[in-house]
Amino acid sequence: MIIKTKYHGETQIQEDQTIVFKNGLPGFTGEKKFVILPLSEDSPFVVLQSVQSEELAFIVASPFVFFKDYGFDLDETTVELLEIESAEDVEVMAILTIEEPFEKSTANLMAPIVVNRRKMLAKQVILHDSSYLTKQPIGGEAC
């Protein structure tokens, strides 16, 4: 199918590339289908693009690129919702806010996106009782 995207114009995607957020994203509960697209060839960043809304796209990256010791436990409800059977099925992404200069850019570590890559199910998880920030500076080490 062809979708309209924020950063790449019209783009051909396969149905099996679609990631389903059963409950939508916080603030975007009606948006349930997304696809991951490259931002550029050599970038650690990718685009989490809504299949339904052209303008709804987030720059995301693995938080481990910037924060090697990042970690959290998933609650049983999330494990069941995402049908996670193995840790190898899980990919974690952080939504980034890219600023100029890049050193001012931040990552939302308090609300990571957890994806079951085998089942193509995802959820943005809110880490209550966490010391992580919604605007954690990432610095320039991935440039």
UniProtKB/Swiss-Prot annotation:
Its main location: cytoplasm. GO terms for biological process: bacterial-type flagellum assembly; regulation of translation. It is found in: Cytoplasm. GO terms for cellular component: cytoplasm. It comes from the Bacteria. Keywords: Bacterial flagellum biogenesis, Chaperone, Cytoplasm, Translation regulation. Acts as an anti-CsrA protein, binds CsrA and prevents it from repressing translation of its target genes, one of which is flagellin. Binds to flagellin and participates in the assembly of the flagellum. NCBIfam families: PRK13285.1-1 (NF009793). PANTHER family: FLAGELLAR ASSEMBLY FACTOR FLIW. Interacts with translational regulator CsrA and flagellin(s). HAMAP family: FliW. This is Flagellar assembly factor FliW. The gene is fliW.
